[in-house]
């Protein structure tokens, strides 16, 4: 596809039928993907394989407590999704203006702001609140 690094998303959700997440992880590694964004359930079962193969992991979180767990299991970056981002499991209706500074204060790893950023003013606000 390209000789440049690229990323993919792996949403890990509970299902009635088994989902081949192990095969997805293998395809990500064998395909040379260097950045993965995970969402839904914890990426913990895949972290050793991703790390051993040089894959950077960004985990999408809707609460600081989820972000802290993501940091503990070794993700490289957390994407904090304020309520404005919409549609993510575990939402507690907390907006980005509250979540962004709470996450950046609690975490040692980089935090990316997600949701409610529509123009340069929103970007400046996210940066001012400590996001990268």
PLM ranges: what are they?
Residues 1-110:
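Active-site entrance/lid segments in N-terminal catalytic domains of soluble metabolic enzymes
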């Amino acid at each position: 596809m390209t000789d440049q690094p690229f990323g993919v998303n792996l949403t890990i959700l509970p299902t009635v039928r088994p989902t081949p997440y192990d095969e997805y992880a293998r395809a990500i590694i064998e395909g040379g993907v260097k950045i993965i964004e995970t969402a839904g359930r914890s990426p913990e079962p895949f972290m050793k394989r991703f790390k051993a193969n040089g894959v950077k992991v960004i985990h999408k979180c809707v609460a600081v407590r989820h972000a802290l767990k993501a940091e503990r299991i070794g993700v490289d970056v957390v994407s904090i999704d304020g309520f404005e981002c919409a549609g993510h499991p575990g939402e507690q209706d907390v907006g980005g203006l509250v979540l962004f500074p709470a996450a950046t204060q609690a975490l040692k790893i980089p935090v990316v702001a997600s949701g409610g950023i529509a123009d340069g003013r929103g970007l400046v606000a996210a940066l001012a609140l400590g996001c990268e």
